[in-house]
Amino acid sequence: MGFKLNPFSKKPKDEEPLPLEQYEASEQKILGLVTKKEAKLLAIAGTGFLLDSYDLFIINLVSPILAYLYWGGLTGHQDYPSGIRGVVNAATNIGNIMGQLLFGFLGDFFGRKFVYGKEMMVVIIATILIICLPDRIPTPTAKMMWLFAFRVMLGIGIGGDYPMSASITSEQSLINRRGALLAWIFSNQGWGTLAGCVATLIILACFEKPLNDRGEYTKLNGVWRIQFGIALFPAVIVLIPRLRMQESEQFKNSKNMKSPGEGDLDSASQIELHDFKKKESLTAEFTTSSPSTASLSDKKNPGSVHIRPNNEVAPSSAPSRAPSTTSVESNTEGKESDIQTGSSFVSYFKEWRHAKLLIGSALSWFLLDIAFYGINLNQSVILQEMGFNKGVNEYHILQKNAIGNLIIAVAGYIPGYWVSVVLIEVMGRKWIQIQGFLICCLLFGVLAGTWETISTGGRFACVALAQFFFNFGPNTTCFVIPAEVFPSRVRAFSHGICAACGKAGAILSALLFNKLTEVIGFGNVLWIFFGCMVAGAVVTLILPETANRDADLIDRLEIAAMQQGRTSIIDRSEKWAWWKHGI
């Protein structure tokens, strides 16, 4: 095995799958892109994210209908309180936090197979309860509380999909294709948003005669229920395949503390960690290779460190915490209880080198989602600020609002995701995340400084570009990095924590956006988003570049180093070490 120092170098074409992988590299690819098994994984997990995005963002298109139906919008005296609007908009994100933490923990504790699919059951039940809102509920506020309660439940199911799909995809992908597959799955959020816009336009077209010709706006009561109810179809379709998904072999090995590969680690003294004395780096671009390939790699990368073939440590195997019976035995005497405890989540993150990765991943996601959801959950409000709320009647206003959302989705939202899919293995995660933060920062600065004077076309272009660089930027990488930077034994819960922090930012934005817009104006709210983008770019510097990073192998090497009395496997004197390994 070798470790290449250049995180952006070309991967060997003959790279073999990870030892415990379910997908064979030699399998014929569909259209030269993905294998059949990868396509199945993308369909099962990707459909879930399409559904997740649809459910999360459809409230953006339903909210004006709720204002018309229940808050006097049809009488010309609309009074949809910003506080209640914010709570209803934030409901799914509140549930997301619960679901991400709960299912992330359960995914690590019980296993991926036991948990996967259960979150979709919650989504199906919650969606049915949402569309069954009783008309006999007397007050608009009570109706909104019904929607709030069951959209929280919906959010729990949607939230559970984040850590589970991320962990399963990461553990069942080739290491040099992992980022692209994770980004591909996450990109289905773009299609979900597009589906919401298209579905709304089709539904409105079906109701054109009663709404536009006869002015029977009570029919909107059926429109919003259909908007929510459409999500049931993909949810039911994907449920059975998820329940039948096999356990990740990589995860099973991580939980089997006495697996065959574990014994190899007891010979940790045979790992050539003496290279640290020569100031050589371990944590860089990781590739699995045959002995001959490793030798070739070493010639190109003289700083690589070897594991002897007869004592090969499988990257996907769980780390052993048992004391060595070789030359390191004396160093581990009296430490056995600490080592055994070290397999737990708390013990893993009590070390600063691990804790800072969790902090950096979580904080960057938090800062991103303040701006990302501030824009997306209130895109209809923003379109109104741009003049998209004008029309002959309510029907045309709703139609124009959906068209505006559709244009932004097509112009910036979806292309941004797919540029990430294409370039994530070329540019690396860290660079994409930082440039996305900085360009969004620039765009928000332009909008904030010129909001009162810039033309409608200029506003629209800036918002569309911001959507592009959100997705060709931190919105994609904040999902990918936690799935790659943590080892399998803590991956799902760690990803859940990071995602939950992101949703905390989304909730904060959803609750405060409308109120702050009323108090300080929309332009000044954009200055807050500007600050979040600057902070996000700075926080990203904490994180390592995760392209081709094998977190399980790093975990095992850290344990081997610990057994030899070493505290780190990183050479900070290496050129660009601050970028490769984080500051």
UniProtKB/Swiss-Prot annotation:
SUPFAM superfamilies from the entry?
Answer: MFS general substrate transporter (SSF103473)
Keyword Membrane applies: yes
Query: Which compartments is it annotated to reside in?
Result: Endoplasmic reticulum; Golgi apparatus; Membrane
Q: Which UniProt keywords apply?
A: Endoplasmic reticulum, Golgi apparatus, Membrane, Phosphoprotein, Transmembrane, Transmembrane helix, Transport
Q: What family is this?
A: Belongs to the major facilitator superfamily. Sugar transporter (TC 2.A.1.1) family.
Q: Name one GO biological process term.
A: phosphate ion transmembrane transport
Give the protein name, as stated in the record.
Answer: Probable metabolite transporter C2H8.02
Please give one Gene Ontology molecular function term for this protein: phosphate transmembrane transporter activity
Fetch the Pfam families from UniProt: Sugar_tr
Residue ranges with Polar residues bias: 284-296
| Superkingdom to which the source organism belongs | Eukaryota
Report membrane topology.
Multi-pass membrane protein
In this chain, the stretch annotated as Disordered covers 282-338
Q: Name one GO cellular component term.
A: plasma membrane
Its transmembrane ranges are 56-76, 90-110, 114-134, 144-164, 184-204, 220-240, 357-377, 406-426, 431-451, 461-481, 493-513, 519-539
Spell out the Low complexity composition-biased ranges.
Answer: 314-327
Modification Phosphoserine, positions: S267, S269, S289, S290, S292, S330
